[in-house]
From Swiss-Prot:
UniProt keyword Cell membrane, yes or no: yes
An example Gene Ontology CC term for this record: plasma membrane
Keyword vocabulary terms for this entry: Cell membrane, Lipoprotein, Membrane, Palmitate, Signal
Name of protein: Gliding motility lipoprotein GldH
Top-level taxonomic group: Bacteria
Main location: membrane
Phenotype upon loss of function: Cells form nonspreading colonies, cannot digest chitin and are resistant to bacteriophages. Whereas wild-type cells can bind latex spheres and propel them along their surface, cells of the gldH mutant fail to do it.
Lipid linkage positions (S-diacylglycerol cysteine): C19
Length: 159
């Protein structure tokens, strides 16, 4: 019985991981119960095949404590030469009725947000992500952004 259960578990694991063949990097980092405006989430990317193209995504886990309809992020890619390309991005996080977008059956949702397409990497890169949310009509940023629990970065190989 124990061998049969182990075999079923192994088969389930193989099926689960084989369904995601495009993934070459996928990592999350926790930001706790609130994402502080000065907290930068950094990912050290692996060295990838420089002849292939990749699609890049910012992944988020959020819950019903997220108080806004959209999200502003500052994403910086640091190249091996030290050059840094910075983008300010806006993503819709909630439907017009206020329910969170994303995948998940509980109050925790996962959102896979498109960042860049057809990117080639030549060497070792770093990605830095910080939140840049502001309340409507206010200049200072939200000090501690509630509702975002984890920030991730994902790289998929282009077909």
């Amino acid at each position: 019985m124990r061998i049969k259960n182990s075999g079923i578990l192994l088969l389930a694991a193989i099926l689960l991981f084989s369904c995601d063949k495009k993934r070459v990097f996928d990592e999350y980092k926790s930001v706790g119960s609130a994402w502080h405006k000065d907290s930068v989430v950094t990912f050290d990317l692996p060295v990838l095949d420089s002849t292939k193209k990749y699609n890049l995504f910012v992944n988020l886990r959020d819950n019903n404590n997220y108080p806004f309809n959209n999200l502003f992020l500052i994403v910086a890619i640091e190249t091996p030469s030290g050059f840094t390309k910075v983008d300010t991005l806006e993503y819709q996080m909630a439907n017009p009725d206020g329910t969170l977008m994303g995948n998940g059956f509980t109050d925790i949702k996962e959102s896979k947000l498109y960042y860049k397409e057809d990117v080639k990497f030549k060497g070792k890169y770093k990605v830095h992500i910080k939140q840049a949310v502001r309340e409507s009509g206010k200049i200072p940023g939200v000090e501690a952004l509630e509702g975002i629990t984890d920030v991730g970065f994902r790289i998929e190989q282009k077909d």
